[in-house]
Amino acid sequence: MSVIKMTDLDLAGKRVFIRADLNVPVKDGKVTSDARIIASLPTIKHCLEAGAKVMVTSHLGRPTEGEYAEEFSLQPVVNYLNDALDCEVKLAKDYLDGLELNAGELVVLENVRFNKGEKKNEEELSKKYAALCDVFVMDAFGTAHRAQASTHGVGMHAPVACAGPLLANELEALGKAMDKPARPMVAIVGGSKVSTKLTVLESLSKIADQLVVGGGIANTFIAAAGHNVGKSLYEADLVDTAKKLMDECAIPVATDVACAKAFDENAEAEIKHVSEVQDDDMIFDLGPESTAALAEILKNAKTILWNGPVGVFEFKNFEAGTKGISEAIAASEGFSVAGGGDTLAAIDKFGIKADVSYISTGGGAFLEFVEGKVLPAVEMLEARAK
């Protein structure tokens, strides 16, 4: 993947426009989770220290496009940056007709979604963004799968378009896991429905040496192996698809499961062999035998790609499968990449953050990359690198 990297450029005196992902939760005018801002700080600091004239922007929430709404303003982000950096940070509300900036100065450009034409990637708006800068830095992997004016169009018209450190690291890590993985390569796909992850499963079945399925997805594969899944969440119309995938790739099917009679936090977990599941049972997790078998597979893996928990880990009685998988990934000496909201929640819950080689910042973008789709922002950066 050939893109220009921001860190390879001389930015002294240059007007630098950074499209970051500062879409953080805000309550009562205060940022309540600063993970995305913290992730963007090294990029901003690098530009400031290089003596650039720095502009950074993002979307925040889902305002009506083209209309200012205070609840979606980036002002709380500006307040946060003022505390985090050794320079005064200002918010620019009207910036499309130009800005005056000094070297080493930082301005946050108000929410891009307040600008009409942002989501539709309109050329007129893209050119206005591009006219503000000498260098456009795309550093928001989380929105790289959307062709919008601030993520794609601006890069087509800016004098130089490059990948920021966050985006470059993301592409490198995902490329390492997907393009030429060290083998054996094990992929874990969890979630409730095969239908929502079908393209992910099909893509990974061609790359992985072992494809581990979990959650409601696993129930469809258990049914495909000829077992009763009782009242469990599964998709009868995709049983044949599951069989086809099992013919094409090594997909270990659970031998034992944790069941209950109702979807209830306090329901007792009954461990059963898959052949013993009753018509009124609901499968909510892997059993200890299955978890141990998967842990053994992960122990020997050289590359692990993880998307989705393998059970209802939010319930104490049904967390053992996901906990076991998490601990096996943490203990593995292989290269591991994890992504997706529920996966990140599991990583936090079981305290293995430091033991995962790379944690992806993108939800939808991560999935589209894993599906083998070309991300519009990445395609633009590749085109501009030629």
From Swiss-Prot:
<dbReference type="GO" id="GO:0006094">
    <property type="term" value="P:gluconeogenesis"/>
</dbReference>
<comment type="pathway">
    <text>Carbohydrate degradation; glycolysis; pyruvate from D-glyceraldehyde 3-phosphate: step 2/5.</text>
</comment>
<dbReference type="InterPro" id="IPR015824">
    <property type="entry name" value="Phosphoglycerate_kinase_N"/>
</dbReference>
<feature type="binding site">
    <location>
        <begin position="21"/>
        <end position="23"/>
    </location>
    <ligand>
        <name>substrate</name>
    </ligand>
</feature>
<keyword id="KW-0067">ATP-binding</keyword>
<protein>
    <recommendedName>
        <fullName>Phosphoglycerate kinase</fullName>
        <ecNumber>2.7.2.3</ecNumber>
    </recommendedName>
</protein>
<feature type="binding site">
    <location>
        <position position="314"/>
    </location>
    <ligand>
        <name>ATP</name>
    </ligand>
</feature>
<comment type="subunit">
    <text>Monomer.</text>
</comment>
<keyword id="KW-0963">Cytoplasm</keyword>
<keyword id="KW-0547">Nucleotide-binding</keyword>
<feature type="binding site">
    <location>
        <begin position="59"/>
        <end position="62"/>
    </location>
    <ligand>
        <name>substrate</name>
    </ligand>
</feature>
<feature type="binding site">
    <location>
        <position position="197"/>
    </location>
    <ligand>
        <name>ATP</name>
    </ligand>
</feature>
<dbReference type="InterPro" id="IPR001576">
    <property type="entry name" value="Phosphoglycerate_kinase"/>
</dbReference>
<keyword id="KW-0418">Kinase</keyword>
<dbReference type="InterPro" id="IPR015911">
    <property type="entry name" value="Phosphoglycerate_kinase_CS"/>
</dbReference>
<feature type="binding site">
    <location>
        <position position="36"/>
    </location>
    <ligand>
        <name>substrate</name>
    </ligand>
</feature>
<comment type="similarity">
    <text>Belongs to the phosphoglycerate kinase family.</text>
</comment>
<dbReference type="GO" id="GO:0006096">
    <property type="term" value="P:glycolytic process"/>
</dbReference>
<feature type="binding site">
    <location>
        <position position="146"/>
    </location>
    <ligand>
        <name>substrate</name>
    </ligand>
</feature>
<dbReference type="Pfam" id="PF00162">
    <property type="entry name" value="PGK"/>
</dbReference>
<dbReference type="GO" id="GO:0004618">
    <property type="term" value="F:phosphoglycerate kinase activity"/>
</dbReference>
<feature type="binding site">
    <location>
        <position position="113"/>
    </location>
    <ligand>
        <name>substrate</name>
    </ligand>
</feature>
<keyword id="KW-0808">Transferase</keyword>
<dbReference type="GO" id="GO:0005829">
    <property type="term" value="C:cytosol"/>
</dbReference>
<dbReference type="InterPro" id="IPR036043">
    <property type="entry name" value="Phosphoglycerate_kinase_sf"/>
</dbReference>
<dbReference type="GO" id="GO:0005524">
    <property type="term" value="F:ATP binding"/>
</dbReference>
<keyword id="KW-0324">Glycolysis</keyword>
<dbReference type="GO" id="GO:0043531">
    <property type="term" value="F:ADP binding"/>
</dbReference>
<feature type="binding site">
    <location>
        <begin position="340"/>
        <end position="343"/>
    </location>
    <ligand>
        <name>ATP</name>
    </ligand>
</feature>
